[in-house]
């Protein structure tokens, strides 16, 4: 059948013209990793920023577990905290792919700074941009794009992978306000945040349909920051308890609608998983790029160790894994941008890239030998930073479960 179609005289000219036009335009089918001029400029700009502004601060921020305040201001000045927020609100007015590119480039130097930008753009900004009222968008997107860190409060001590087994309650009062009580745990950006998206259960009898998202500002007297975690990695990014103690919010602080918190959180996390994939991809590329030059320079038995077959097999295998991760991540981002279902691709990208990040960091330490085990080389920090990729925004087992569900769903169509 296909042969007949190709040999049909009517189709031969169409095929020939198509090939001729393709050879002229060179743009018949663009590779997944092709970037627009604007995206390429962003990539170069963020790479330069990361090397010039972030790299000199990485060691101190890691040792002290503190984000440099001047660097945070620089992130806002560079518009990296509002990448796909409209310029009418002070944002960079780019696309979702722009956020992914920035996250990847920052992670090549410091995954901790990368995740700060990731949570801001793929979770907080996106949720308010999509579900916020006109008044909420005008107020909060302007703040988030220019000077205010955002935080996404879902997890609790008793709700990790079962993220919606929430104990935090929101009780409606006679005057229409809601009183929030509960403790959120492992909340990224909590120490620096001025705006929090808080998930609370208004009606536990309704299950996940009782969950509602509220916007709470840091100056609310009922909200305070609790214990800051002393973490293995991504130490410049704060991870804290957020304690809600008779925290009063107005009906106008509801994000979306009453009972829509589950949908808002799920959609936000699905997009956030592409962001984490980009972070882990950048980490893998960063540790790889910092290791190869040493292998070229270091000599044993009169030869650069990069020429030894055992070494070659190791770093060639890593290069394949990293490039596959880039294809998965960029493809998921492009599908999301096109408005198509992307959950399957997002989970695959996060699963693969988080695995590759740990694999790459571990392998690079082994290839570096003794120096890789010291803090003189960045590989040990990349190794510590890599582990969280398999934990937050859905563990690797949750990603496998999601992928399996999507396979079954598509098979049964």
From Swiss-Prot:
GO biological process: fatty acid metabolic process; isoleucine catabolic process
Top EC group: oxidoreductase
Keywords in alphabetical order: FAD, Fatty acid metabolism, Flavoprotein, Lipid metabolism, Oxidoreductase
InterPro entries, per database record: Acyl-CoA_DH_CS (IPR006089), Acyl-CoA_Oxase/DH_mid-dom (IPR006091), Acyl-CoA_Oxase/DH_mid-dom_sf (IPR046373), AcylCo_DH-like_C (IPR036250), AcylCo_DH/oxidase_C (IPR009075), AcylCoA_DH/ox_N (IPR013786), AcylCoA_DH/ox_N_sf (IPR037069), AcylCoA_DH/oxidase_NM_dom_sf (IPR009100)
Residues annotated to bind substrate: 161, 208, 262, 270-273
Keyword Cell division on entry: no
UniProt EC number: 1.3.8.5
Protein name (record): Probable short/branched chain specific acyl-CoA dehydrogenase
Source organism phylogeny: Eukaryota, Amoebozoa, Evosea, Eumycetozoa, Dictyostelia
């Amino acid at each position: 059948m296909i042969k007949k179609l190709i040999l049909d005289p009517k189709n031969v000219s169409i095929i020939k013209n198509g090939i001729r036009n393709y050879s002229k335009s060179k743009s018949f089918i663009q590779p997944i990793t092709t970037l627009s001029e604007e995206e390429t400029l962003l990539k170069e700009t963020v790479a330069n920023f990361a090397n010039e502004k972030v790299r000199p601060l990485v060691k101190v921020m890691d040792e002290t577990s503190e984000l440099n305040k001047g660097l945070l201001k620089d992130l806002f000045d560079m518009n990296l905290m509002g990448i796909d927020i409209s310029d009418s609100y002070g944002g960079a007015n780019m696309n979702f792919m722009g956020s992914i590119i920035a996250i990847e480039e920052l992670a090549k130097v410091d995954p901790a700074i990368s995740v700060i930008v990731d949570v801001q753009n793929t979770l907080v900004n996106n949720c308010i941009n999509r579900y916020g009222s006109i008044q909420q968008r005008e107020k909060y997107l302007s703040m988030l794009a220019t000077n205010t860190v955002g935080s996404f409060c879902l997890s609790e001590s008793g709700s990790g992978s079962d993220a919606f087994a929430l104990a935090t309650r929101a009780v409606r009062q006679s005057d229409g306000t809601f009183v929030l009580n509960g403790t959120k745990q492992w909340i990224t950006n909590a120490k620096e945040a001025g705006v929090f998206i808080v998930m609370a259960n208004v009606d536990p009898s309704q299950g996940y349909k009782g969950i509602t998202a509220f916007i709470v500002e840091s100056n609310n007297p009922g909200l305070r920051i609790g214990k800051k975690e002393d973490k293995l990695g991504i130490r410049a990014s704060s991870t804290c308890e957020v304690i809600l103690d008779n925290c009063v919010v107005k009906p106008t602080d509801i994000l979306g609608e009453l009972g829509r918190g589950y949908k808002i959180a799920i959609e936000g996390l699905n997009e956030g998983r592409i962001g984490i994939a980009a972070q882990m991809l950048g980490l893998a590329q960063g540790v790889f790029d910092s290791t190869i030059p040493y292998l070229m320079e270091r000599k044993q038995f009169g030869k650069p160790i990069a020429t030894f077959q055992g070494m070659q097999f190791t770093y060639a295998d890593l290069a394949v894994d990293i490039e596959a991760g880039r294809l998965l991540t960029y493809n998921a981002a492009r599908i999301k941008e096109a408005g198509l279902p992307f959950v399957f691709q997002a989970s695959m990208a996060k699963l693969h890239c988080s695995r590759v990040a740990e694999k790459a960091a571990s392998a690079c330490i082994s290839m570096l030998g003794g120096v890789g085990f010291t803090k003189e080389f960045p590989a040990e920090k990349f190794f510590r930073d890599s582990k969280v990729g398999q934990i937050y925004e859905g563990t690797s087992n949750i990603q496998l479960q999601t992928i399996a569900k999507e396979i079954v769903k598509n098979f049964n169509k």
